[in-house]
UniProtKB/Swiss-Prot annotation:
It comes from Clostridium novyi (strain NT). Its main location: cytoplasm. This is Argininosuccinate lyase. One of its GO terms (cellular component) is cytosol. SUPFAM superfamilies: L-aspartase-like.
């Protein structure tokens, strides 16, 4: 069942039919394809290319196809080349020869281009809503757990921070992701419908009308670019990759924190699994799967970049390969965002363990150096003094605050009784710009 064949002597082989067909994956574009066709038919009637009665018959037929698909009466299956063929052939079967006028002034090249832009735009707004849900979960988790913990560099305990500071770093990441997606929408918000195969059409059509009907801000500037542009999908895949990278980093920390080596958090049973052989195991599989699926989205980005790198203008069948990877990335990002929101909303903090971890690792060493600077010593000299104290403490299994004043004075006579209050862990967060964290 094809929309072409007049110039061919021999039938297409079954092997080629199967190899060429995209129906099994581009069927998810059925709504966009029907919506685009309805806008196209309205425009053809407005421009006097179709009669008013023909317009109504075709639109009614398209709506009936949409309703039957939505209600499960019509299954998207069979020996069709793609979703466009499926809908047009079913339309002709329903309304007769008038349905053959649907494709007047249009190519599948601009048809699939507008379908993909509509889908990409719609799904991006949907993903933004998933990000908004995650941002709310992060904010609630941070605000409801006022606890201090170690901050890390090089995965080594570094300085005292609040849990809120740590979690709001991820808020900043995902908020950037949202801004990036909004920028992607701004760039892609142009209609390619009316570009034809590559050089427009001899019909006096109204591209601006269909652009408005379909909710685009304008028409594309160049016909050839309009049908062959997949930059917006690559840009979205790049944005999706960054979202997954941020989810993966957060997942990695949840995996570490839930281990007995850290024991900072407890991931709920709802987002954990067990072992078939080790009865004691409770594995952070939700976080591990998010971390693992990140490479899958990266692969979709690299796949489309590689597909597009050597294609001459204008449309080439290579571009059919834009869909499976993009659709898979969309599904992966949506599921990963949803799972992360669920995992964080049920996360339990082990606050005592977090606080106790602060007491190990000399997390107040920087504050001790600042103390000496406030007493008049140059910071580099203070850095050296505190480094020597830390070495002594390590060798003697003590903390800086455990040393008596007399011992501290053997390293520097600027130390006084107020050093203990100055380097107390919670007090260190109440000075200077740190008060804002």
């Amino acid at each position: 069942m094809k929309l072409w064949g007049g110039r061919f002597k021999n039938a297409e082989s079954k092997l080629m039919e199967d190899f060429n067909s995209s129906l099994k994956f581009d069927k998810r574009l059925y709504k966009e394809d029907i919506k685009g066709s309805i806008a196209h038919v309205k425009m053809l009637s407005k421009c006097g290319i179709l009669e008013g009665e023909e317009k109504l018959i075709i639109i009614d037929g398209l709506i009936s196809i949409l309703d039957d698909i939505e209600n499960g009466v019509l299954k998207i299956e069979g020996d069709y080349e793609d979703i466009h063929s499926f809908i047009e052939i079913n339309l002709i079967n329903r309304v007769g020869d008038v349905g053959k006028k649907l494709h007047t002034g249009r190519s599948r090249n601009d048809q699939v281009a507008v379908d993909m832009r509509m889908y990409a735009k719609s799904i991006t707004f949907e993903i933004i809503e998933y990000i908004n849900e995650l941002l709310e979960v992060i904010t609630n988790l941070a605000d409801s757990n006022d606890v201090i913990m170690p901050g890390y560099t090089h995965l080594q305990r570094a300085q005292v921070i609040k849990f809120k500071l740590h979690m709001m770093a991820y808020y900043s990441m995902f908020n950037r992701d949202k801004k990036r997606l909004l920028s992607d929408i701004e760039v892609m918000d142009e209609s390619p419908l009316g570009c034809g195969a590559l050089a427009g059409t001899t019909y006096n059509i109204d591209r601006e009308f269909t652009a408005r009907e379909l909710g685009f801000k304008k028409c594309v500037d160049n016909f050839m670019d309009g049908v062959s542009d997949r930059d917006y999908l690559i840009s979205l895949l790049s944005s999706f990759s960054l979202i997954m990278m941020h989810l993966s980093r957060l997942s990695e920390e949840l995996i570490l924190w839930s281990s007995k080596e850290f024991d900072f958090v407890k991931i709920s049973d709802e987002f954990s699994t067990g072992s078939s052989i080790m009865p004691q195991k409770k594995n952070p599989d939700a976080a591990e799967l998010i971390r693992g699926k990140t490479g899958r989205v990266y692969g979709s980005l690299m796949g489309l970049l590689t597909t597009m790198k050597g294609i001459p203008l204008a449309y080439n069948k290579d571009m059919q390969e834009d869909k499976e990877g993009f659709f898979d990335a969309v599904d992966t990002v949506k599921k990963s965002l949803k799972v992360m929101s669920g995992m964080l909303s049920t996360l339990e903090l082990k606050k005592d363990n977090m606080y106790n971890a602060v007491k190990k690792g000399f997390l107040n060493a920087t504050e001790a150096a600042d103390y000496l600077v406030n007493k008049g010593m140059a910071f580099r000299d203070a850095h050296g003094v505190i480094g020597a104290i830390v070495l002594y403490c390590e060798e003697n299994k003590k903390a800086i605050e455990d040393l008596p004043l007399e011992k501290l004075k053997t390293f520097c006579d600027l130390f006084d009784e107020d050093i203990y209050d100055f380097i107390e862990y919670s007090n260190s967060l109440k000075r200077g710009i740190k008060i804002n964290i």
